[in-house]
């Protein structure tokens, strides 16, 4: 929501992640046999309603569909997480997620903080690799 509106061929575009934060439905529609979904939040994460919705309603009042997407984003996100959990339990997909909450500002330029987060990701990837290899070998 912090990004600027993009205009292309006289159409206005905003961050597509608002309407479809985890585009897994598109992925499954492609019909691939093995699917890997990479999440940015640890297991058990639940997205909460946006606390600044009153302000966003005013700022984007001329874009009612965008406001509706913002208002329901947490519901859609959480429903997608539920679907992914069901598919993961059934062995239909492999989900990669961080082992802990990784909170980093959008424009972080602190080398030590970026290194810390990188190391978490690297450790998690190495820990996940055997299970991922087994999933892909099935």
Which residues are covered by each model-predicted region?
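Patatin-like phospholipase
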Residues: 3, 8-138
């Amino acid at each position: 929501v912090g990004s600027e509106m993009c205009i292309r061929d006289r159409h206005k575009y905003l961050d597509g992640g608002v309407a479809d934060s985890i585009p897994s439905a598109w992925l499954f529609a492609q019909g691939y046999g093995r699917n890997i979904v990479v999440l940015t939040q640890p297991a058990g994460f639940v997205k909460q309603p946006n606390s600044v919705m009153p302000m966003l309603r005013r700022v984007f009042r001329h874009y009612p569909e965008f406001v509706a997407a913002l208002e329901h984003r947490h519901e859609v996100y959480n429903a997608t997480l539920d679907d992914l959990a069901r598919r993961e339990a059934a062995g239909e997909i492999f989900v990669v997620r961080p082992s802990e909450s990784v909170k980093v500002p959008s424009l972080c330029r602190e080398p030590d903080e970026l290194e810390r987060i990188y190391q978490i990701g690297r450790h998690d990837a190495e820990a996940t690799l055997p299970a991922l290899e087994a999933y892909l070998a099935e």
